[in-house]
């Protein structure tokens, strides 16, 4: 059995690398593009690079069943997959470090997309391994450890990288990224001797038994299995998922149809986070446009932004203890939408460190509050023993909002200007709140 201290170290490492990897192809790459004066329209379109994070749940059955025989005997089922994905990430990040967005944009974007795919893949595997090695009584505590590691990883790969760009080129920084992933892999292998994760997933925790449609023998078929059964599995799995979410609820028995209700929920999940996701893609070009340097962006926008989000999460959690969830979602959504008006004030006044600090502080705190309510809402929709699958599918809507719709953000800025862009991010919150009022009586 794992000792509690070993569990904490391993879970912290899991969180660290997840947060670190998402920044490699996320905000840090976005900042590099902006510094290279890549067109705003192009920067917006390249938000699709993070799309694999939206659909990583589709690959979960593969990593539950397929074994890497050459590594499985040495490291075990999960760790062998982690070793493979980490090695691939090291190689791809090293290749990316020799490219230049100014001259190799297409190739660099393609490699970044593949990096994002393997990062999302690793997240899925780490999540599965985390559920296997953490005792039930430590789930709450280790979740905090995981989030702490995640935030540290994000800070180092975003704020830390932008600060380093004062002294180093981004090519050198991405070489450092590859070295960090290598060190992480070595550390994880060293502590892996403490793990006791199983090689074959038990029936009651297997992804495939969510839909109850295949036997263990069928699950271990190789190429023939994936060709014949992969999509059938997901059809059955999603059907079981939808039935389980709403079985026994007011929704399932009321005049509003199940399909219509589900569509409304999915639209809400996309629209509620859309303003933040539009801004996140354009925030680096906006700050550079105003004349802020790398140090100011790293310290105020990135570092203080993360701290503000943490504080906002705590405030949101406290408020939700005394107010019901739907009231909190509505209240936080309105407050956060109004905070976007501060970006217009910043654009009107030009470079002003005090206004920047106030804007980022308020936007981050209210953003942390909305995120807390958002996650709580998703969790409330998940019922029964299929919660993991339900949560993965619902949370993928957040990823779609982050990866697909922000494609238009660059075009909006170029054609309508920064002030109208931020005004739009304020107004676009209204449809999501109207949908919330529509569905609240059915929840």
UniProtKB/Swiss-Prot annotation:
Organismal lineage: Bacteria, Pseudomonadati, Pseudomonadota, Alphaproteobacteria, Rickettsiales
Protein localization: Cell inner membrane
Keywords: Cell inner membrane, Cell membrane, Membrane, Transmembrane, Transmembrane helix, Transport
Main location as per UniProt: membrane
An example molecular function term from Gene Ontology annotations: transmembrane transporter activity
One Pfam family this sequence matches: MFS_1
GO cellular component: plasma membrane
Keyword ATP-binding listed: no
Protein name: Putative transporter AmpG 1
Transmembrane segments: 6-26, 43-63, 74-96, 106-128, 144-164, 172-192, 255-275, 300-320, 326-346, 355-375, 394-414, 416-436
Gene: ampG1
Superkingdom as given in the UniProt entry: Bacteria
Similarity section: Belongs to the major facilitator superfamily.
Membrane topology: Multi-pass membrane protein
Entries under NCBIfam families matching the protein: 2A0125
């Amino acid at each position: 059995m794992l000792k509690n201290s070993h569990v904490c170290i391993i879970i912290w490492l899991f969180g660290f690398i997840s947060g670190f990897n998402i920044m490699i192809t996320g905000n840090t790459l976005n900042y590099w593009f902006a510094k290279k004066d890549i067109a705003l329209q192009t920067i917006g379109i390249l938000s699709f690079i993070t799309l694999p994070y939206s659909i990583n749940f589709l690959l979960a059955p593969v990593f539950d069943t397929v074994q890497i025989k050459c590594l499985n005997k040495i490291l075990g089922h999960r760790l062998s997959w982690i070793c493979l994905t980490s090695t691939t990430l090291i190689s791809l990040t090293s290749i990316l470090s020799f490219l230049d967005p100014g001259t190799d944009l297409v190739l660099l974007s393609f490699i970044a997309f593949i990096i994002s795919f393997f990062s999302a893949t690793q997240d899925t595997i780490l999540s599965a391994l985390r559920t296997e090695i953490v005792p039930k009584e430590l789930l709450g505590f280790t979740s905090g450890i995981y989030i702490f590691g995640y935030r540290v990883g994000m800070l180092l790969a975003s704020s830390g990288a932008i600060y380093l760009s004062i002294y180093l080129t981004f090519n050198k920084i991405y070489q450092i990224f590859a070295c960090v992933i290598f060190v992480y892999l070595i550390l994880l292998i060293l502590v892996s001797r403490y793990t006791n994760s199983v090689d074959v997933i038990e029936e009651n925790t297997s992804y495939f038994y969510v839909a109850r449609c295949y036997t263990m023998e069928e699950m271990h078929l190789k190429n023939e299995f994936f060709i014949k059964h992969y999509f059938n599995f997901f059809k059955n799995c999603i059907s079981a998922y939808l039935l389980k979410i709403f079985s026994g609820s007011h929704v399932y028995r009321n005049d509003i149809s199940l399909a219509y209700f589900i569509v409304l929920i999915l639209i809400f999940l996309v629209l509620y986070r859309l303003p933040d996701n539009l801004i996140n893609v354009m925030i680096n070009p906006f700050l550079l446009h105003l004349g802020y340097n790398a140090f100011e962006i790293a310290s105020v926008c990135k570092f203080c932004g993360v701290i503000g989000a943490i504080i906002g999460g705590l405030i949101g959690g406290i408020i939700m203890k005394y107010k019901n969830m739907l009231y909190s979602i509505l209240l936080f959504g309105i407050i956060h939408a109004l905070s976007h008006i501060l970006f217009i004030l910043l654009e009107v006044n030009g470079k002003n460190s005090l206004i920047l600090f106030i804007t980022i502080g308020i936007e981050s705190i209210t953003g942390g509050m909305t995120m807390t309510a958002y996650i709580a809402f998703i969790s409330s929709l998940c019922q029964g023993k299929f919660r993991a699958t339900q949560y993965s599918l619902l949370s993928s809507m957040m990823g779609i909002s982050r990866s697909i719709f922000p494609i238009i953000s660059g075009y909006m800025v170029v054609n309508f200007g920064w002030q109208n862009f931020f005004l739009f991010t304020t107004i676009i919150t209204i449809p999501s709140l109207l949908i919330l009022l529509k569905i609240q009586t059915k929840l």
